[in-house]
């Protein structure tokens, strides 16, 4: 097999898949007119079911825990999905750069649908978690690729609006998810929370295949080419044409196998330590300490390997596709890492707020899953409004950092107000405190991704691959924050609840695990102002205090973000992309 080297933007775009051009205008592969809007609609549908799978789970936790009897494992209904979602984001970006966007997205949808089917048919908590993990593998690709594809179909000026449109899928799912999930759980069965992904995913595949033309080929021509390739395949031909040494080098260096393995193992061990601490094992036990310390060390070593050791072992330094997943030139660039830390911190706090806002109404007021989900409508409506406003403002005025700071300020104020939500607060307070966190995330997330993309040097030969990987890294940080938010919030709640119950010496709860305490509470509800109701309220408030800390750190990073603005062309300039003046 011949050695592949790249020396021009055209060759780089070929390495990224021919549909990976940064300059959408003038690319034969980019949809135009109605096809563009339908293609964006298909990507939005894909992101909708991806987000739905995160948010709908919050409404089934108590029902599933009661059916399978493992409340402490319910945290893994979120983590089992969001952890592979985070870890594999970078891999999907690299995978798409090799085989192209279209094939990667279709594969990701199929994996996601398979995971949803497994979860829907689950007969035990472990099987349900396994289905969530499989769905998370596919969901990781969907989140990464939808933003990459959407951003590369239009010019730079229209990217903020596209990012906002795609982000609205998450916000709409946050409204619909708890309502649909609650309705299914209360009136039908929680299994339909996963069955619903199947028809929506199928529709998204059809729309995408009909509107997105990779290599300027229609879907029928692509199917014909694929059949021809498969029919001409023979093992002897494969054996003679493939250099297995180069194949192994491709796996190790194109996909950064060792860096990925170290990073994944580190994150998994660290999150296991947080999950087991205070539940299965005490915090000072050797098992928990080993998980936490070893997890941190492996993660640090993965960074050392990618930043300093990868190039020393790289057999083909001139091959642009042989590069680490976490490229020091990009990831360690202050302007990029700062805005991605904003994404990570705000998503950590926001996910904790979302999960325990639902738990607040279910555990304290014994609300059904459906009614508890309705309380999230304020936080989601404001998220949609802010996301759209952010995209329009950036497209028209080019502002990025002001929106980032504005979102950070609203996040701190909103998180502070959420600590006022207790079992004695009024209905208006319970609704009002949920408004600002939605505004915060809507403004900040779009601005952070746009700010990161603006740092790419467009005249570099590998600019197209840089664009993919910066976008994938942002998705990685977003998913990692969501994952950590779910685990940490459960850890804080469980530890706080267990300690407070132990000090109160409540006879029905003494000697029970947190799982058993929660189940006993659900089966023997004694009001929102009882002793156990007060303890639950205080424990959930501690989660909200933790979220406030993450928002405060996020605002601090917002203040140090780049001052770069989106360049707005003069009115008499020719529209720069295929979303302009349609």
UniProtKB/Swiss-Prot annotation:
Belongs to the major facilitator superfamily. Residues 66-80, 126-132, 182-191, 278-287, 351-372, 423-430, 493-539 are vacuolar. The gene is VBA5. Transporter required for vacuolar uptake of basic amino acids. SUPFAM superfamilies: MFS general substrate transporter. Keywords: Amino-acid transport, Glycoprotein, Membrane, Transmembrane, Transmembrane helix, Transport, Vacuole. This is Vacuolar basic amino acid transporter 5. It is a multi-pass membrane protein. GO terms for molecular function: transmembrane transporter activity. CDD domains: MFS_Azr1_MDR_like. It comes from the Eukaryota.
């Amino acid at each position: 097999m011949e050695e592949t080297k790249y020396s021009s933007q055209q060759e780089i775009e070929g390495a990224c898949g021919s549909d990976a051009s940064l300059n959408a205008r003038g690319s034969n592969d980019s949809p135009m007119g109605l096809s563009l809007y339908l293609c964006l609609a298909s990507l939005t549908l894909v992101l909708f079911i991806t987000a739905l799978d995160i948010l709908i789970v919050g409404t089934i936790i108590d029902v599933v825990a009661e059916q399978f009897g493992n409340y402490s494992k319910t945290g893994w209904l979120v983590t089992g999905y969001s952890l592979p979602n985070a870890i594999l984001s970078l891999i999907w970006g690299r995978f798409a750069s090799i085989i192209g966007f279209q094939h990667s997205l279709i594969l990701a949808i199929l994996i996601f649908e398979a995971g949803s089917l497994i979860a829907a048919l689950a007969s035990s908590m472990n099987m349900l978690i396994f289905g969530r993990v499989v769905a998370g593998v596919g969901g990781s690709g969907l989140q990464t690729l939808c933003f990459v594809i959407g951003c590369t179909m239009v010019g730079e000026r229209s990217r903020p609006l596209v990012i906002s449109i795609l982000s609205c899928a998450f916000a709409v799912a946050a409204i619909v998810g708890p309502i649909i999930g609650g309705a299914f759980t209360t009136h039908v069965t929680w299994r339909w929370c996963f069955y619903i992904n199947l028809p929506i995913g199928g529709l998204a595949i059809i729309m995408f295949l009909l509107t997105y033309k990779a290599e300027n080929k229609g879907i029928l021509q692509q199917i014909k080419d694929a059949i021809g390739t498969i029919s001409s395949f023979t093992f002897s031909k494969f054996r003679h044409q493939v250099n297995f040494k180069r194949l192994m080098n491709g796996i190790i260096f194109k996909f950064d196998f060792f860096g990925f393995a170290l990073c994944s193992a580190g994150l998994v061990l660290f999150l296991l330590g947080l999950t087991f601490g205070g539940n299965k094992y005490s915090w000072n036990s050797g098992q928990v300490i080993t998980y936490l310390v070893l997890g941190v060390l492996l993660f640090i070593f993965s960074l050392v390997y990618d930043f300093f050791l990868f190039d020393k072992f790289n057999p083909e330094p001139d091959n642009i596709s042989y590069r680490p997943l976490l490229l020091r030139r990009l990831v360690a660039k202050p302007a990029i890492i700062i805005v991605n830390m904003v994404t990570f911190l705000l998503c950590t706090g926001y996910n904790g707020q979302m999960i325990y806002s639902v738990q607040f109404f279910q555990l304290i007021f014994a609300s059904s899953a459906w009614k508890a989900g309705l309380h999230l409508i304020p936080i989601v409506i404001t998220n949609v409004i802010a996301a759209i406003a952010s995209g329009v403002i950036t497209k028209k005025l080019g502002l990025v950092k002001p929106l980032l700071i504005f979102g950070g300020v609203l996040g701190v104020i909103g998180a502070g107000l959420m600590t006022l939500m207790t079992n004695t607060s009024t209905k208006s307070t319970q609704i009002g405190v949920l408004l600002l966190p939605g505004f915060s995330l809507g403004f900040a997330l779009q601005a952070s991704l746009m700010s990161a993309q603006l740092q790419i040097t467009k005249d570099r030969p590998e600019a197209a691959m840089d664009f993919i990987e910066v976008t994938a890294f942002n998705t990685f940080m977003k998913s990692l924050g969501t994952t950590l938010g779910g685990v940490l919030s459960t850890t804080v709640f469980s530890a706080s609840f267990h300690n407070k119950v132990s000090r109160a010496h409540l006879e029905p709860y003494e000697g029970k695990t947190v799982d058993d305490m929660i189940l006993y509470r659900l089966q023997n509800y004694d009001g929102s102002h009882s002793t156990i109701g007060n303890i639950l309220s205080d424990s959930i408030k501690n989660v909200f205090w933790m979220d406030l800390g993450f928002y405060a750190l996020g605002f601090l990073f917002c203040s140090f973000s780049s001052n770069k603005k989106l360049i707005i062309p003069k009115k008499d300039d020719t529209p720069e992309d295929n979303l302009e003046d349609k």
